[in-house]
Amino acid sequence: MKRENRSKKYDYFNSSSNNSNKFSKTNFKKYFKIFKLVVYIFLIGLALTGCIQSFVVQSSPNVGAGLELYPSKDKVAPRVNVYKKEENGYVKDRNINELLKDEQSLQALKDFSKNHNGVYGKTKSSNSALAILEDNTYIDSDGQENKSIIYKDNSGKYLFFNDTLTTYDPINKFTDIYAIGRLTERDSDAIKFRENNPKIIEHLKLFKVSEVPISREYQPNIKFARDFLQALYDKTLKLPVYQNILRADGSKYASFNEFLTSLEKRTTNHLKTQLNKQELSEEDLNSITLSDSESAALNAYLTRVNPLISENGFTGLKKSLNNADDFELVYSQGEKIAQSDYGQIPVVTWGEYWNYGPFYALLVAPIASFTNWVASAFESGFGIVFAIIVVVVVTRLFIFGLTFKVTFSQYKQQELQGKKAKIDAKYAAYENNKMMKQRKQKEIQDLYKKHNISPIDFVASIAWSSPLFIAVWRVIQSVPVIKSNFFLGVNFSTASYQEILAKNWVYLWVVSLALIVQIISQILPRWLAKKKIKERANVYEMQSYKKNNKTQNIMLIVFMVFTITLQAGVQIYWIIGGLWTIGQTLFVHHFQKTSFFKNRVRPWLDRH
């Protein structure tokens, strides 16, 4: 009984009890270090996987193509090709990356695909839809405002195609479409004007675009291609520059096509007259002389309609079925009419994220869900930029919390730079001696151990930040509501440097700001550290500092080149992330000077 009532305080003098406690603490620290090392290796592995998958799993700047992260299946959108009305024609506006949000229209596209034995939103399928924009308003076939964006006929049928469809029914009536020449460089002489008189046309060669049989068995992609072209062609020929010929006093043409074929016939007769060396009569000369309206229309046709035919895939050549001596343009099988560079990969469920591995399932999925949730509160413009700001702040705060100890322990490493530099100098003459190298590493390890610094802890910052940084970057690239955003004249899906090379100077502010922020965010920590080093630097420490500085300068140049090549949306993210880095650097620098840090935080860091 007496032994049971004995105070536990006497156990202090029991050496075996003390050794047991020390052993358990030592083992705990040892296993905890191993656990941290395993976690860091796993995180770095995730970062490397994400980096590799960024190239393997293709993304596209276009909505409706490449990897896309949607909040639900009902939001999966197609590739919408926007043709904007410009002078004398319709031109594809590559600065508009339209995201179809209308639920009724999206459901109609699903039903359309199902009715034609296709699957809407199937992984790696290509799709395409047409939208026509006039005076900042989308229109339908009647020229009326079209709130559903996608071009449709009077019955409400959309001009849409998915390459999983087995059939396709055109919404337009196919009519004759003519190209001036074969649309290749070697046929640049398909039209010839008299020297010093551009109103006298001496030669014109037309190539008819082949009509596609309307049988259900005919290839649906070719029928869609012809339907797509017909819609744009019909809209183009309704413009005043072409209609003026038909409305002119004494006009003998019922259609613009009739004007073209008549002109071709007249120039052919003129050529025969020249070959027979007959004298050209005044009547013959008048027949090949264009009026002002005819000259304007012909030049407009060359600059607007010919490119439409070419860019929509009708560049092949075959003998005409109606005339064995003539040829017509046919659809090139290798073309994908107005479709995107990559098949669409819509990802919605967590299971679909797992199909691409743990990087997507564990990191990209939650960040994408949060981003879509925040972005859903905004339509476009600055609202989407604000959503990116929220995502950056949340992820960076999370990283800052996880790397708090490492971030504020850097002052210790800075104080030890001088001592480490002395060790480096001590063994500088033994670069090729393996035994002396081992002794050098042992001394450096003992130095860090003495001051309670673990090299593993400094891997933590890279281990936590790298996978999250790549994951957010991937999300910014792949969330459609961000890809389709337009802010201060900048399309988020466009590569800024390409626009600048095309003399679209509005993109200069994005590239310039991204570069400036990137330079400051990398130079500022070095500049602040240099101020500290100069206060107490020795020769060895300055040599070590200069050596590290050269390496960092090379990395800065690499990052600058990388920044220039990014899409505008990612550059916006780069700017926001860089501003956070600058703010965090200044906060840490000044916070370390406060009495609170010196009296509370630093002692805690020294103990841990």
Curated annotation (Swiss-Prot):
CDD domains membership: 5TM_YidC_Alb3
Annotated InterPro entries: YidC/ALB3/OXA1/COX18, YidC/Oxa/ALB_C, YidC_ALB_C
Cell membrane is among the record's keywords: yes
Pfam families for this protein: 60KD_IMP
Residues passing through the membrane, by range: 37-57, 382-402, 453-473, 505-525, 556-576
Domain of life: Bacteria
GO cellular component: plasma membrane
Subunit: Interacts with the Sec translocase complex via SecD. Specifically interacts with transmembrane segments of nascent integral membrane proteins during membrane integration.
PANTHER family linked to this entry: CYTOCHROME C OXIDASE ASSEMBLY PROTEIN COX18, MITOCHONDRIAL, OXA1
Full protein name: Membrane protein insertase YidC
Gene: yidC
